[in-house]
Amino acid sequence: MCIRDRLHTELELMRMNARRTRHKSQQTGGEGNLAKILMTSALHRTRELAGAILGPEMILWGEEAATGGVIQEMAIFSPAPSIYGGTDEVQRNIIGERVLGLPKEPGPDKDTPFSELLQNKTDW
């Protein structure tokens, strides 16, 4: 798929999800979580696409860069949204539990004090 088609596909996916979210009849309750996952995924793919377009220029920084470093800053920043606001894994767990009705992952009781939590425990 050519670069133009990839960009168009990215934009259309984001546009269709936003349109679906606006219609109350199609809301599931996990729109915010899904939007965050889609946004972080789009940022990662955009970074990869920028690298494909710029090639070796992608490693240049500041005034030496063809874009003045804007694309490079985006590339450095792109992993951050998948962490802040709850990791993508946490967002997927929320969607699974609240929207799809899947059981919660096993873990300690909510009332367990932090000091009593075991490190690296695997057999909850």
Question: Which residues are covered by each model-predicted region?
Answer:
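Alpha-helical interface subdomain recognition
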Residues: 1-124
